[in-house]
Amino acid sequence: MMRLYYFLSFLLLPIYFVIIFIRLLIGKEDIRRVKERFAIGKHRQDNRFLIWIHAASVGESMIALNLVDNISKHFPEVRFLVTSWTQSSAKILSTKLPKIATHQLLPIDNIIFTKIFLNNWKPDLGIFIESELWPGTINEAAKQCNLLLVNARMSDKSFESWKKRKGFFQLIVKNFSEVIVQSERDLQKFNELGISNTTNLGNIKFANEKLPVNQEELIKLSEHLKNKQVILFASTHPEDEEIILPIIKNLKKQVIDCYIILIPRHPERIKSILDNCIAQDLSATAKSQNDLPVLTDDLYIVDRFGEMGLFFSIASISFIGGSFKQGGHNILEAAHFSNCIIFGPDMSKNTDIAKGVLQSKAAIQIKSGEELLNMLEYLLDPNNSRELKNYQENSLKFVERNQKILDEYLQIITKFFP
């Protein structure tokens, strides 16, 4: 089966080049770094123990940063290679990784580029985060070092798909020395697919450290918005904005002192978002146009990476994007800042976190734009200020209770150290 995969990936090599070229044209690749997709780039510098961590996108990248930080505290001699796939994660990792770590884009999953990449780096331990499984890369890497799959999760859709290709799934995942899943539900799915070397430690995102905040910026922003109730729409997709933008006018009519801030999941969409605002008769300014919100505008759009923590710091309520159709994003980043958290009907990629925060009365789930509008108006009514405060306090308590998970992950990871 793996030989067939290698053969097909070799035949598809010309198509890979076309795909990368198209991604360049639409802004999903950085021309300065595109060579890394073909394993042309940096290489290992010394013989110190090297841990390779692969983080597909932004959420996984935050976990990778946390792992690098905590492992290096206990093992300062260890060095790290962190790979990712998306440009958004690349920008975050390139700016936030410490000097003991190097970031590189993951090469295309083709045996030629994979072997060059592994020969350049020769990792001593590989850690893959969550659910991105590149068959060729994993199979070749397992020949060189132990591999761990951490915070593993599987959506119901993926589970049904893998059941039809159970043998191939086993061929990939059995390359991992340990599989650490994030919930009992995920454990059952992996076991049913024939993977027995699994452990459920819970979701390591529970243990993610608080997002960094520029204190000078925070003071300036807080002073600027001191008389406003800030509502943050975080990590939004076009499908979220189709629902959010039409309710903003009504919300601002009902709640005079509220101010809306929107942070798209992909800031490169800023032009289309501004165009949609105009179509909805909304006045909006992007952060790239003005460092501070224009108070007479209907909303402020943050089109820069790495500033989520700053805006969680000033928000009273945060709606977490991707929760109408994309399966949801990380709720817990907002919980660290004691926000009242709201999310939509689709949390299929974060089922257990969603269930946990709802049971703890640390978040609110809505089903539609109308429900969202009604809930925001209700929470911002001065008569309901105590209820709003309870949600804010409960969100922080929830995330604080789960900090021990990281220590349990590190106990397993460090078993594979020399």
Swiss-Prot record:
GO process terms (BP): lipid A biosynthetic process; lipopolysaccharide core region biosynthetic process
Residues binding CMP, per UniProt: P264, R265, F305, G306, E307, N330, I331, L332, E333
Membrane topology: Single-pass membrane protein
Cellular component GO terms, alphabetical: plasma membrane
Keyword Protein biosynthesis set for record: no
Major subcellular location class: membrane
Keyword set includes Kinase: no
Pfam families per the UniProt record, alphabetical: Glycos_transf_N
Residues the record marks as active site: E60 (proton acceptor)
Subcellular location: Cell inner membrane
Residues passing through the membrane, by range: 7-27
Recorded catalytic activity of this chain's protein: lipid IVA (E. coli) + CMP-3-deoxy-beta-D-manno-octulosonate = alpha-Kdo-(2->6)-lipid IVA (E. coli) + CMP + H(+)
MF terms in GO: Kdo transferase activity
Pathway the protein takes part in: Bacterial outer membrane biogenesis; LPS core biosynthesis
UniProt-annotated site: Transition state stabilizer, residues: E130, K205
Protein purpose: Involved in lipopolysaccharide (LPS) biosynthesis. Catalyzes the transfer of 3-deoxy-D-manno-octulosonate (Kdo) residue(s) from CMP-Kdo to lipid IV(A), the tetraacyldisaccharide-1,4'-bisphosphate precursor of lipid A.
Family according to the record: Belongs to the glycosyltransferase group 1 family. Glycosyltransferase 30 subfamily.
Name recorded for this polypeptide: 3-deoxy-D-manno-octulosonic acid transferase
Organism: Rickettsia bellii (strain RML369-C)
Gene behind the chain: waaA
